[in-house]
Amino acid sequence: MDNYWKGKTICFLGDSITEGVGVVPGERYFDFLSKELGFTACGYGVNGARYVDLYEQALRMKKEFGSNTDAIFIFAGTNDFFLNTPPGEWFNYAEEDVAALKNDDGTPLKIETRKVRQFNFDTDTYKGSINRLMSFLKHNYAEKQIFMLTPLHRAYAEFGPLNI
C-alpha cells in the first residue's frame, strides 16, 4: 500500500507504553503501524519515564540518527501524573528594555521597558520539562513533524491524594 509514511523513518519517545512493557516483542503500538504503513520504527521508550526523562531519549536519538528521521512521536505524561510532578508554568515573566520606535536604518529612537515572556525550563515541573524537550526537538528537527500524544485516560487507576 502506497502512503505518505512508506519508506520513512519515525522515532518514538515515551514511557512503558512505548517501550512495550507487557506485550510480546514486535507488538508495540508503533510496530503495528510500521507493518501497516511501511515505515521504519525506532523506539526509545523507557518504563517509568516522565517528561524530564524524554530529554535523554532525544539525545540518544540525535546521537544514533542525527537528523535522519522523518518524524518524531512523543507519548508520555502518565508517570508525571502518577508521581505528582508539579504542573509548573509554561512561561516566566520578566521586564526587558526594547526598541519601541526605530528609524529607517533600524537605529532605536525610543527605548521602553516591557514585560516579556520567557520559556520556563524548570525540569522539576511538567510544563518546564515539556518546554525543555520541545526546545531541543524544534532546534534540532525544525523541518520534521513532531506529534505529541496525550496520556491515556485511566478511569480505574489509583493515584496519589494530590491527583484529582
Describe each PLM feature range.
Residues M1-S67, I72:
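Serine-esterase "nucleophile elbow" of acetyl-processing enzymes
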Residues L59-I164:
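Alpha-helical cap/lid subdomain in secreted, periplasmic
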